[in-house]
Swiss-Prot record:
AXH domain segment(s): 457-588
Main subcellular localisation: nucleus
In-chain residues carrying the UniProt-annotated modification Phosphoserine: 284, 361, 615
UniProt source species: Homo sapiens
Stretches with biased composition (Polar residues): 28-43, 200-219
Physiological role: Chromatin-binding factor that repress Notch signaling in the absence of Notch intracellular domain by acting as a CBF1 corepressor. Binds to the HEY promoter and might assist, along with NCOR2, RBPJ-mediated repression. Can suppress ATXN1 cytotoxicity in spinocerebellar ataxia type 1 (SCA1). In concert with CIC and ATXN1, involved in brain development.
Name under which the protein is recorded: Ataxin-1-like
Region (Disordered): 1-46, 185-223, 242-297, 357-405, 617-647
Modified residues (Phosphothreonine): 330
Source taxonomy: Eukaryota, Metazoa, Chordata, Craniata, Vertebrata
GO BP: brain development; extracellular matrix organization; learning; lung alveolus development; memory; negative regulation of transcription by RNA polymerase II; positive regulation of hematopoietic stem cell proliferation; social behavior
SUPFAM superfamilies found in the cross-reference section: AXH domain
Annotated tissue distribution: Expressed in cerebellum and cerebral cortex.
Underlying gene: ATXN1L
Length: 689
């Protein structure tokens, strides 16, 4: 009878049987459980590159050929401290397969021709041995073009054995990644075929057609006890943690004065840490280096990245791609922190002013520094586009919840933490047109002044249009009657003033219409009331006025119709507009008090008592007529605006001397809204409130 092991092998397929290994077979080919090379290629690749992946447990190797000692029956895992590294020369074909070498423990005489990077016609140098620690190393190069050139001594001496003969001339192509970048990355498994090796390589490399590679790379920074850190450029999804770096020398040329001005602006921001304040200094030093001569690719300021408590100097391209390590151990490695650090030294040196609580300013006017460049009188296509323009149109009282806007500031002035910080008298520090990011804060912009003179404050601005001027808006008169804004007539204003009590109708005659000093505004000169008080106001050309016997009119009827869908006539010199003022005011203050302050001009939707509140919504004394009477209220506008929290702008001469009198007069006025009207408007659910 046959032995037991012979009978068991007969039941196995031929490939599973343990065939005896003869010296002829060993001399002819070298075989491995996971890699096989034809015998015809063995002689050509007998001294080629050794590439082996993570072998499975219990994998057997059979060795032989070219003077190598035959070692059989040994597992690969038994050679845990020996690594064999061989790298192709500089003539490596760019169209070759990916040069990803995943080192695994190998015996000293293990010599196998690998099909992973096999390329006919290329000679590879002899193999060299290096005593390396048990941790696996991974060298990643580009499959599309020549990878980075490694500077001398790229491997720290503690990693190499003193007797190791590893010349750096044989390792010109591979860039080591730091251990912190390889913590979360697992080496790709060994593939039995070259086509399988493409699965992992593109995620860690970049095509040469997208971004140019460096001809030489120097370490960006060295951490104590770590290998040099190199950043590889990639536009593809990162399989390994990559930091994008620009082409060599793509940095701006800035004067020391500009860097100093940015430093002072950053130092004025009290919320910065000392490390963040050092960014500008480090940036200035890097820009003054010889490598700062650019290739015309825009501003690329140097940015510091905080990784695992170590400060690494990187570079930031116009397309910022900063990735955090795979396993973030500390908050400093978060992507949000790196973005904040990048924003502090961004291209235009924008200073982000901390958004503060609004404080009462002397005039309580939301002043915005105007856009001195201005723009043409072309009409916007819609109200949303109007808000995105350079604030030359649609200037209305500002909502407190507006997003941050970009606004140019006067020369040599920077807003930091809500305060104007002079950065010097040199006019070249901050050229006109350079954008400064300023938080939308009323008290900040109310104090914004030019260093040379004190001009007239700009009119109140807003990026939202008042909804009560929109066609179809329902207006409640002081008599309780509801009308659409486009259906209002002169008698509606007269009756509302009579019923309200304490009010009187005044006529405001237009005597002159001029262009304002502020872009996008017109200055209207009126003669108001019996005292013939001369009043001048600045309003947007699309602002509607109510003219006796004519209806709504504006300086730009077409634009008013486009923005509000409200039919308008053209306002001309000699037109008499409706204005309502308080009867209790003396003659010398009528022209100032008949218009309420911006805080009092909000629609009744904001008022808790929903009462009819007088001429604050009917008109202002400069000839601007409100769309309804004393109790005008927007009940259901056809085009609601989220930011329509106030009516039109108060004039530049507005003062608050009569604010208390108007408040007292409002408290004396009863509500003229019947209960039936309330139920019809608000619904039955609010009847008990």
């Amino acid at each position: 009878m046959k032995p037991v092991h012979e009978r068991s092998q007969e039941c196995l397929p031929p490939k599973k049987r343990d065939l005896p290994v003869t010296s002829e077979d060993m001399g002819r080919t070298t075989s491995c459980s996971t890699n096989h090379t034809p015998s015809s290629d063995a002689s050509e690749w007998s001294r080629g590159v050794v590439v082996a992946g993570q072998s499975q447990a219990g994998a057997r190797v059979s060795l032989g050929g070219d003077g190598a000692e035959a070692i059989t029956g040994l597992t690969v895992d038994q050679y845990g401290m020996l690594y064999k590294v061989a790298v192709p020369p500089a003539t490596f074909s760019p169209t070759g397969l990916p040069s990803v070498v995943n080192m695994s423990p190998l015996p000293p005489t293990f010599n196998v021709a690998s099909s992973l990077i096999q390329h006919p016609g290329i000679h590879y140098p002899p193999l060299h041995y290096a005593q390396l620690p048990s941790t696996s190393l991974q060298f990643i190069g580009s499959p599309y073009s020549l990878p980075y050139a490694v500077p001398p001594n790229f491997l720290p001496s503690p990693l190499l054995s003193p007797s190791a003969n590893l010349a750096t001339s044989h390792l010109p192509h591979f860039v080591p990644y730091a251990s912190l970048l390889a913590e979360g990355a697992t080496p790709p498994p060994q593939a039995p075929s070259p086509a399988h090796s493409f699965n992992k390589a593109p995620s860690a490399t970049s095509p040469s057609g997208q971004l140019p590679h460096h001809s030489s790379t120097q370490p960006l920074d060295l951490a104590p006890g770590r290998m040099p850190i190199y950043y590889q450029m990639s536009r593809l999804p990162a399989g390994y943690t990559l930091h994008e770096t620009p082409p060599a020398g793509a940095s701006p040329v800035l004067t020391p004065q500009e860097s100093q001005s940015a430093l002072e602006a950053a130092a004025a921001n009290g919320g910065q840490r000392p490390r963040e304040r050092n960014l500008v200094r480090r940036e200035s030093e890097a820009l003054d280096s010889p490598n700062s001569k650019g290739e015309g690719q825009g501003l690329v300021p140097v940015v510091e990245c905080v990784v695992d408590g170590q400060l690494f100097s990187g570079s930031q391209t116009p397309r910022v791609e900063v990735a955090a390590p795979a396993h973030r151990g500390t908050p400093d490695t978060d992507l949000e922190v790196q973005r904040v650090v990048g924003a502090l030294a961004s291209q235009d040196y924008r200073v982000v002013a901390a958004q503060r609580k609004e404080e009462p300013s002397p005039l309580n006017l939301s002043h915005h520094t105007p856009d001195h460049q201005g723009e043409g009188r072309g009409s916007a296509r819609n109200p949303a586009e109007l808000a995105e323009k350079s604030q030359a149109r649609g200037f209305y009282p500002q909502s407190h919840q507006e997003p941050v806007k970009h606004r140019p500031l006067p020369k040599a002035m920077v807003v930091a933490n809500g305060n104007l910080v002079p950065t010097g008298t040199d006019s070249g520090l901050l050229p006109v047109g350079s954008e400064i990011l300023v938080a939308s804060s009323l008290d900040v912009q109310a104090r914004a002044t030019f260093p040379d003179k004190e001009p007239t404050p700009p009119p109140i601005t807003s990026s939202h249009l008042p909804s009560h001027f929109m066609k179809g808006a329902i207006i409640q008169l002081a008599t309780g009657e509801l009308k659409r804004v486009e259906d209002l007539q002169t008698q509606d204003f007269v009756r509302s003033a009579e019923v309200s009590g304490g009010l009187k109708i005044d006529s405001s005659t237009v005597v002159d219409i001029q262009e304002s000093q502020w872009p996008g505004f017109v200055m209207l000169h009126f003669v108001v009331g019996e005292q013939q008080s001369k009043v001048s106001i600045e309003v947007p050309p699309e602002h509607p006025f109510f003219v006796y016997g004519q209806g709504w009119s504006s300086c730009s009827p077409g634009r008013t119709t486009q923005l509000f869908s409200l039919p308008c006539h053209r306002l001309q010199v000699g037109d008499v507009c409706i204005s309502i003022s308080l009867q209790s005011l003396n003659s010398n203050s009528v022209s100032q008090a008949s218009c309420a302050p911006p805080s009092q001009l909000g629609p009744p939707r904001e008022r808790p008592e929903r009462t009819v509140l007088g001429s604050r919504e009917l008109c202002d004394s400069e000839g601007k007529s409100q769309p309804a009477g004393e109790g005008s209220r927007v009940v259901e506008p056809s085009q609601p605006e989220s930011g329509a929290q106030a009516c039109w702008p108060a004039p530049s001469f507005q003062r608050y001397s009569m604010q208390g009198e108007e408040a007292r007069a409002a408290l004396l006025r009863p509500s003229f809204i019947p209960q039936e009207v309330k139920l019809s408007i608000e619904g039955r659910s609010n009847a008990g409130k």
